[in-house]
């Protein structure tokens, strides 16, 4: 029997607790496809290049590029609506936002990307002619 495997879904919730004590829950739903993994990797490479550029000399243009790249990562992984809510929650404080959210991305989402890539690689090995 030939088996087709559906793409993995990443489902999670992030709760935002505001200064006034109120909370808002962001529902994260990400279908992990090879294209999503590829686009995330491209954004990672872009962020690393911008970090090198930033270290060689801080200027407003580089800071703006880093901010835009961070927003691109969040749009890809969390969706535009959730990214907008995150920007509002952090009041556009990119440093705090990155400090708090990148460990979540690295600890929760990236391992799922790695699992999907590994499963895909194993599936290709089985299907070789």
Each model region followed by its residue ranges:
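C-terminal charged interaction modules
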Residues: 80-129
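Contiguous, amphipathic alpha-helical segments that mediate oligomerization or scaffolding
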Residues: 56-70
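Residue-level detector of alpha-helical secondary structure
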Residues: 37, 48, 71, 99-102, ...
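Conserved catalytic core of Hanks-type protein kinase domains
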Residues: 77
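Low-complexity, flexible helical/coil segments
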Residues: 7-13, 63-66, 113, 123-124
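Short N-terminal mixed-charge amphipathic segments
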Residues: 1-58
């Amino acid at each position: 029997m030939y088996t087709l495997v559906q793409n993995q879904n990443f489902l999670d919730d992030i709760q935002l607790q505001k200064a006034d004590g109120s909370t808002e829950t962001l529902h994260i739903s990400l279908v992990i496809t090879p294209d999503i993994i590829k686009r995330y990797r491209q954004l990672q490479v872009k962020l690393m290049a911008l970090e090198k550029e930033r270290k060689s000399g801080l200027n407003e243009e580089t800071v703006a590029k880093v901010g835009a790249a961070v927003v691109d990562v969040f749009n890809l992984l969390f969706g535009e609506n959730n990214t907008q809510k995150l920007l509002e929650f952090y009041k556009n404080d990119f440093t705090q936002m990155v400090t708090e959210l990148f460990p979540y991305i690295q600890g929760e989402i990236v391992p799922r990307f790695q699992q999907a890539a590994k499963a895909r690689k194993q599936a290709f090995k089985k299907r070789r002619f």
